[in-house]
């Protein structure tokens, strides 16, 4: 288990370094990260289309400006613009190279392929294998299904949007894409919270061994997770719209959060969106995991002396599941931290009227690019983390991916035998433990 955990840690460190190097390379080349890949959290800033142009990042209601150089009068002021309308523009021009677009498209294709293979295989393992249909695994399947919807619908559209520059899909798809993105993130967050609570309940009731099947409360949890996630994603569908502006004499359509919302609620949502995303979609799962894993550790230490030998194998399995859930939460935190950090730093440190803002803006662009790519990786990395950490999932992945040529009956029989073997052994040990207790009490 330690070797698997260390391999998982090394893989995550390598992923962080690779994304960091790619982001720094894009900054040196002058690529704009915020537009390179559409933000999964719905960034409010707007980039100019993928051509060589100057770029200025403004407030929440900033819109695109023409890339033509501003005419400066003898007094040093921009012609036709009041002195206090805009801050002095950044002197540095940001260029979008075709090489960058192709590299980002390749990364999106890799995420698309790995995400479909990994998440669909994970769903197949849990669906076909009766012994894998328990509470925690059903929650993991719900998480994988949400990631799969995001991968199938959003990633191809975002990659095409980068290559095309203009938004060609209409207002309906402009509302659907951020809606699915937000719903997918909500399903991930709430599923991780439910898994953390479930692990504490399992350890707190360590003497009760559950059989095969999905508890009714787990089914209710999954329904609530999907309903709440969909409801919380509705403001994205309401607020996003296709904004048409003039760019070099041609109309340019951009899918973005409309800076001019019609209702008071949507205006408040636009203003408080970044803080809401950071608190609910990032801090909440980390806080719940920290609280319930602390309680779980205290419970295990308190009952360690009273645990019976007959239950050791079953407790080891529960500890393995707890480590697996903790690894999923850790992967989520590492993948989403750079993007949330970029948003919070912009809200707290970035001042549009500061003449020295361009240096901070350059750093935020690099961090934003790293965060967007790592957030996309979170949709395909969960099956990989399960493969590295959990022995049961690792064996099931191997048998599922390496036995495609077998008949359906052979594959089903092999999966059931492999996964049910340990469960039957543990159940037999628990029966012996109960019979010994009855004998001693009589």
UniProtKB/Swiss-Prot annotation:
GO biological process, one term: regulation of blood pressure
UniProt name for this protein: Endothelin receptor type B
Signal peptide residue numbers: 1-26
Transmembrane segments: 102-126, 138-163, 176-197, 219-243, 272-296, 325-350, 363-389
Cystine residue pairs: 174-255
GO MF annotation list: endothelin receptor activity; G protein-coupled receptor activity; peptide hormone binding; type 1 angiotensin receptor binding
Membrane topology: Multi-pass membrane protein
Intervals, Cytoplasmic compartment: 127-137, 198-218, 297-324, 390-442
Positions of post-translational Phosphotyrosine modification: 439
Organism: Rattus norvegicus
Protein localization: Cell membrane
GO cellular component: nuclear membrane; plasma membrane
Protein family membership: Belongs to the G-protein coupled receptor 1 family. Endothelin receptor subfamily. EDNRB sub-subfamily.
Residue numbers with lipid attached (S-palmitoyl cysteine): 402-403, 405
Keywords tagged on the record: Cell membrane, Disulfide bond, G-protein coupled receptor, Glycoprotein, Lipoprotein, Membrane, Palmitate, Phosphoprotein, Receptor, Signal, Transducer, Transmembrane, Transmembrane helix
Role this protein plays: Non-specific receptor for endothelin 1, 2, and 3. Mediates its action by association with G proteins that activate a phosphatidylinositol-calcium second messenger system.
UniProt cross-references to InterPro entries, sorted A to Z: Endthln_rcpt, ETB_rcpt, GPCR_endothelin_rcpt, GPCR_Rhodpsn, GPCR_Rhodpsn_7TM
Sequence ranges on the Extracellular membrane side: 27-101, 164-175, 244-271, 351-362
UniProt note on tissues of expression: Widely distributed in cell types of a variety of tissues.
Residue numbers carrying Phosphoserine: 305, 419, 440-442
Pfam family, one: 7tm_1
Residues with glycosylation annotation: 60, 97
